[in-house]
């Protein structure tokens, strides 16, 4: 009987010590914004303005990556395309630019007007 009680007490102590206290206060987090763009894209400069505005609003917390690929980014000089960027555009079936993923949390890329409201 004593052994069973000691065993249960030991298991309970292990379970209680395994709990991690988590705060309920709002925490700052970093944001990763992938912007798909092209040098012949009409609206892409406005997308860059929006992305830079978000980065200025949260200095040191927003990381921007521009991926030049697709029909708006021909392989003429200066060629900003990469094989990885082209593969990402094809895999995500992106046809309108600028498009972006915020922290890669959505299944589909969203337009520049939705970047600041995305989780």
Regions found by a protein language model. Name each.
Residues 59-85, 94:
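Thiol-based oxidoreductase modules, predominantly thioredoxin-like and allied folds used
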Residues 48-49, 83-87:
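Alpha-helical scaffolding within the catalytic cores
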Residues 44-48, 75-78, 111-114:
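Short, solvent-exposed loop/turn and secondary-structure capping segments
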Residues 92-119:
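Non-catalytic, surface beta->alpha helical segment in thiol-disulfide oxidoreductase systems
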Residues 1-25:
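Bacterial Sec-dependent N-terminal signal peptides
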Residues 8, 69, 104:
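Residues that line or immediately flank small-molecule/substrate-binding pockets and catalytic motifs
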Residues 22-69:
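Local sequence-structure signature of Cys/Sec-based thiol-disulfide redox active-site neighborhoods
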């Amino acid at each position: 009987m004593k052994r069973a009680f000691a065993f249960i007490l030991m298991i309970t102590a292990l379970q209680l010590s395994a709990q991690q206290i988590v705060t309920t206060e709002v925490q700052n987090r970093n944001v990763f914004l992938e912007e798909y763009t092209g040098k012949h894209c009409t609206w892409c400069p406005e997308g860059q303005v929006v992305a830079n505005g978000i980065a200025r609003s949260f200095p040191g917390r927003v990381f921007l990556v521009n991926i030049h690929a697709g029909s708006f980014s021909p392989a003429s000089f200066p060629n900003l395309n990469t094989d990885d960027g082209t593969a990402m555009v094809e895999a995500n079936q992106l046809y309108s630019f600028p498009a972006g993923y915020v922290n890669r949390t959505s299944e589909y890329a969203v337009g520049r007007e939705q970047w600041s409201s995305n989780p």
